[in-house]
């Protein structure tokens, strides 16, 4: 399934992938919207 990862995130089937990167299609243009996830740590002193 790892080789099929790009196709799955374009179709939005894999919720882990599609949460990280959403394909937004409006009219004839498609853009990739990144939702940054992970640790949001405060700045180190």
Curated annotation (Swiss-Prot):
It comes from Escherichia coli (strain K12). GO terms for biological process: translation. Its main location: cytoplasm. It comes from the Bacteria. Keywords: Cytoplasm. The lineage of its organism: Bacteria, Pseudomonadati, Pseudomonadota, Gammaproteobacteria, Enterobacterales. Induction: Induced upon entry into stationary phase, this is controlled at least in part by the RpoS sigma factor. Pfam families: SRA_like. It is found in: Cytoplasm. Residues 21-45 are annotated as: Disordered. GO terms for cellular component: cytosol. This is Stationary-phase-induced ribosome-associated protein. Although this protein associates with the 30S subunit of the ribosome it is not considered to be a bona fide ribosomal protein. Belongs to the SRA family. GO terms for molecular function: ribosomal small subunit binding. InterPro entries: SRA-like. Associates exclusively with the 30S subunit; there is 0.1 copy per ribosome in the exponential phase and 0.4 copies per ribosome in the stationary phase. This is also true for several other K12 derivatives and strain B/R. Disruption phenotype: Not essential, a quadruple raiA-hpf-rmf-sra knockout strain is significantly outcompeted by wild-type after 4 days growth.
């Amino acid at each position: 399934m790892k080789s099929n990862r790009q196709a799955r995130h374009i179709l939005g089937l894999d919720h882990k992938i599609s949460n990280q990167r959403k394909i937004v299609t409006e009219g004839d243009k498609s853009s990739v919207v990144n939702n940054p996830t992970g640790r949001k740590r405060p700045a180190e002193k």
